[in-house]
């Protein structure tokens, strides 16, 4: 009966049914494409709007100087401890912005000029936007369409993700190529296991993406995530997804070629010198990092004696929207359920390879979390999808309405997405300051990770105030003398002399009429006593806020400030360093 019925159905009904199915699939595909396009548009808008609203950080100035060195001398080892790929993209962006600014079109509309800050950050904002698409592709491959769409939307809207993409650092590019590589990797598995085609093109695409990943940031151990995922299937006799020795050799050859194409400066001897100096921790410019009001040594090799192990867990708890945190906690145990498929092991290895080393290492910055954020958001999307299904079943028990069940599920998803959307809009363009209600909201903004939350964003505005006040040849003491000098030079004040606040010898040169800059996030063991005394006893002549949060104070040196500085310098010279 069953076979007969099937044959009758396929003979009599299938033509019309197939036409209707094609229409449905076409409509669904069009809806998905429209949804993804909207996500990309919104995500791009959030990432590029007022991209130059904040001044450069000291780290970003180093990138700008590397760009200038490339333009002046060709390929060099400038900023050589970091790979070249991102710096090449920054160079192209800065050159393009200059040509845009020189065009006749912009000459008639000065408001269309692109600042150096915006040009330097644009590649990260662009690549960060398309990370949403890669998250969608990867999460859909593992967990299905719904999880893929939710995870992509979370990335597009999340204030932390936006903030990471709006700085000129390597982490965004690392994540982009990591996701691209693993999407190709999973596709190669699907093709090999199904026997529906040749997996080799996906192998070589994976290898090329991994080469670009290493040319973005020297963190090769993340390649182990994909290798570990591959390895767990090799003990299963039925597995068809096997590269073999020959294809592995080709894989690494392609990976190496892509790495060299994207990072040719690795062939320069001076680059290896820069990397060796950096790996020896001889480039650490400051002796502490302020975390939750306490100073800690921030050095990788100190391990658990450096930054607290719970640094990134505090970040997750206080810097992500609360519904996202709760959804992550719901989704995490679900990853251990077999019914979620074998692709979940890639997610579990991703967590293992990131959280285990980054929890125990002694040097930490919030931007390192860029690599972990996609896996957190994918897991949160799994939790949202699960809660939506549970809500749908709960509504079904109360109401006999298919429309109501689907409506309830959709409302839950939209409610979760509304929180990061509102959070990002409310803090724009200073996304790093976002702190959720568990962390105290705006009242505690900037108090957990001040170095990363402020990231020298107000230094440019502080210098603008100083150049209007400072007499010729005045000294300016700060923890970022190079950055101060950069903006003073742009303002036509090459006469100003820059001093390091932590250098007692240079601080001894201060005289009345000079200036001291105290920027939040720049408190260290070496300046803590002086900073505390100035903040408690002196009145700043200039105060600069980042949004609604005080960020920087400028003190004019008079007799009282000079006495305070002298006592601190004398105390250090007596052996109290």
Regions found by a protein language model. Give the residues of each.
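Membrane-interface transmembrane helices that cradle and orient dolichyl/undecaprenyl
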Residues: 140-142, 146, 181-203, 213, ...
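Short acidic/glycine- and proline-prone juxtamembrane loop motifs at membrane-interface regions
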Residues: 57-58, 141, 160, 166-173
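Aromatic/acidic, Gly/Pro-rich catalytic loop(s) in extracytoplasmic/lumenal soluble domains
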Residues: 497-577
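Transmembrane-lumen/periplasm boundary regions of multi-pass, lipid-linked membrane glycan transferases
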Residues: 68, 82-84, 88-89, 224-343, ...
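Transmembrane-embedded, aromatic-rich helix segments that form part
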Residues: 175-176, 205, 219-234, 323-329, ...
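Transmembrane-helix motifs of polytopic, lipid-linked glycan transferases
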Residues: 118, 122-143, 180, 184
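Short helix- or helix-capping micro-motifs
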Residues: 40-43, 151-156, 163, 183, ...
